[in-house]
């Protein structure tokens, strides 16, 4: 049974502007240390995809970025096959459990100008 669904689309220009203006401070605000360590040398599309995925996850949880759900409570790393895998921490995990979710799935896609992500919570 679906317990939550979230989708987000972000323009690459918006993320590029934040990277130019704030650089590592922006990355540290939205990404966990493990996510930052996994970034490629030119991080624009990957960062935009992760941003969209975290926004989608916050929507799927039904809280947005409130009630303790924050960028660092949502972590997306690639599995051995290169697929994005969402890990929930702290308040994000507690919220998913309160919704009856026992598993969650994330899909990230990019175009020339945008990144998009969908998160589904199942239980």
UniProtKB/Swiss-Prot annotation:
Q: Which Gene3D superfamilies match?
A: 4'-phosphopantetheinyl transferase domain
Q: What is its EC number?
A: 2.7.8.7
Needed co-factor(s): Mg(2+)
Q: Where in the cell is it found?
A: Cytoplasm
Binding residues for Mg(2+): 8, 55
Q: Which domain of life does the protein's organism represent?
A: Bacteria
What's a Pfam family this protein contains?
Answer: ACPS
Q: Which GO terms describe its biological process?
A: fatty acid biosynthetic process
Q: Which InterPro entries match?
A: 4-PPantetheinyl_Trfase_dom, 4-PPantetheinyl_Trfase_dom_sf, ACPS, Ppantetheine-prot_Trfase_dom
Q: Which reaction does it catalyse?
A: apo-[ACP] + CoA = holo-[ACP] + adenosine 3',5'-bisphosphate + H(+)
Keywords in alphabetical order, please. Answer: Cytoplasm, Fatty acid biosynthesis, Fatty acid metabolism, Lipid biosynthesis, Lipid metabolism, Magnesium, Metal-binding, Transferase
SUPFAM superfamilies recorded for this chain?
A: 4'-phosphopantetheinyl transferase
A Gene Ontology term for the protein's cellular component: cytoplasm
Drop me one GO molecular function for this one.
magnesium ion binding
Primary location? cytoplasm
* Entries under HAMAP family matching the protein: AcpS (MF_00101)
Its job: Transfers the 4'-phosphopantetheine moiety from coenzyme A to a Ser of acyl-carrier-protein.
As for family, the record states:
Belongs to the P-Pant transferase superfamily. AcpS family.
Protein name as catalogued: Holo-[acyl-carrier-protein] synthase
- Give the source species: Solidesulfovibrio magneticus (strain ATCC 700980 / DSM 13731 / RS-1)
């Amino acid at each position: 049974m679906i317990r939550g669904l979230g989708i987000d689309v972000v323009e690459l220009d918006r993320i590029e502007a934040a990277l130019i203006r704030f650089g590592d401070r922006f990355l540290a605000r939205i990404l966990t240390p493990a996510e930052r360590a996994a970034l490629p040398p030119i991080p624009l599309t990957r960062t935009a995809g992760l941003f969209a995925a975290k926004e989608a996850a916050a929507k799927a949880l039904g809280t947005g970025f409130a009630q303790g759900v924050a960028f660092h409570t949502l972590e997306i790393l690639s599995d051995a096959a290169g697929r994005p895998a969402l890990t929930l921490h702290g308040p994000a995990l507690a919220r998913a459990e309160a919704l009856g979710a026992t598993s969650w799935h994330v899909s990230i896609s990019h175009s020339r100008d945008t990144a998009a992500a969908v998160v589904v919570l199942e239980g």
